[in-house]
């Protein structure tokens, strides 16, 4: 029956290779739980997909669009962190300046600040 179904589909999708790709995609959709547009009649998913294409309950154009969408992927580009970005751009890293103040100098400065208040 599959051979007759393929021959029935050739007038809908003239390129047999494209027909196979579309029918395989539709068979995968059926296997993943998509609802059937025709009766199964004890046929396997690829035959049901071919019958749907032959009876035009699934248009070749909509199948083609869904197949293209299923093969598209979104690639995220990792941006470098701010510190790395500054170095890459040739500027210095934005960090607080470290003082060479010893503990004794810090205490003396605090005492002077408290004495002035």
Curated annotation (Swiss-Prot):
Keywords: DNA-directed RNA polymerase, Nucleotidyltransferase, Transcription, Transferase
A molecular-function term among this protein's GO annotations: DNA binding
GO cellular component: DNA-directed RNA polymerase complex
Reaction equation(s) it catalyzes: RNA(n) + a ribonucleoside 5'-triphosphate = RNA(n+1) + diphosphate
Superkingdom of origin: Bacteria
Single biological process term from Gene Ontology: DNA-templated transcription
Top enzyme category: transferase
InterPro entries in UniProt: DNA-dir_RNA_pol_omega, Pol_omega/Rpo6/RPB6, RPB6/omega-like_sf
UniProt keyword Signal present: no
EC number: 2.7.7.6
SUPFAM superfamilies: RPB6/omega subunit-like
Subunit structure: The RNAP catalytic core consists of 2 alpha, 1 beta, 1 beta' and 1 omega subunit. When a sigma factor is associated with the core the holoenzyme is formed, which can initiate transcription.
Listed NCBIfam families: rpoZ
Family membership noted in the UniProt record: Belongs to the RNA polymerase subunit omega family.
HAMAP family (alphabetical): RNApol_bact_RpoZ (MF_00366)
Function: Promotes RNA polymerase assembly. Latches the N- and C-terminal regions of the beta' subunit thereby facilitating its interaction with the beta and alpha subunits.
UniProt name for this protein: DNA-directed RNA polymerase subunit omega
């Amino acid at each position: 029956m599959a051979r007759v179904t393929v021959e029935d589909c050739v007038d809908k999708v003239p390129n047999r290779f494209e027909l196979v790709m579309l029918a395989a995609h539709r068979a995968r959709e059926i296997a993943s739980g998509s609802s059937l547009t025709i009766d199964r009649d004890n046929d396997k998913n690829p035959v049901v997909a071919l019958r749907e294409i032959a009876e035009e309950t699934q248009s070749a154009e909509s199948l083609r669009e869904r197949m293209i969408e299923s093969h598209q992927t979104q690639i995220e580009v990792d941006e470098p962190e701010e510190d790395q970005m500054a170095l890459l751009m040739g500027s210095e890293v934005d960090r607080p300046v470290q003082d060479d103040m010893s503990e004794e100098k810090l205490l003396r400065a605090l005492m002077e600040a408290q004495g002035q208040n």
